[in-house]
């Protein structure tokens, strides 16, 4: 029987590098949202209200791997008062 690491490695070695990067970026953004919510002592409900969105949408963002649009990232940055992502200088 395979352990979890072997199973995970077997599944991920078949995934394209582009998808792996996409999943990692989504996970990083979700982690940043969670961190900012905690730092600002803000709930998902409060964030949803600031965005004018349903709380279930915010919940789905933080529990899955959403394909965030630039507009959504911008709206989240404004609502949280800090940038979610930064582009490295050349």
Where does each model-flagged region fall?
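N-terminal flexible/basic segments that precede or flank functional cores
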Residues: 1-35, 39-40
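Short basic helix-loop element that most often maps to the first helix and adjoining turn
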Residues: 31-50, 75
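Helix-turn-helix DNA-binding elements, focusing on the entry/boundary residues of the two helices
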Residues: 44, 55, 70-73
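Recognition helix of helix-turn-helix/homeodomain-like DNA-binding domains
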Residues: 51-67
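DNA major-groove recognition helix of helix-turn-helix/homeodomain DNA-binding modules
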Residues: 71-86
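Short, charged recognition helix plus adjacent turn
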Residues: 88-90
């Amino acid at each position: 029987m395979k352990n979890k690491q072997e199973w995970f490695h077997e599944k991920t070695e078949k995934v394209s590098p582009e998808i792996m990067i996409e999943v990692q970026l989504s996970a990083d953004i979700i982690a940043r949202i969670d961190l900012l919510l905690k730092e600002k002592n803000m709930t998902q409900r409060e964030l949803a209200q600031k965005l004018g969105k349903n709380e279930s949408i915010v919940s789905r963002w933080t529990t899955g791997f959403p394909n965030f649009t630039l507009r959504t990232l911008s709206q989240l940055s404004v609502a949280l008062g800090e940038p979610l992502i930064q582009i490295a200088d050349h």
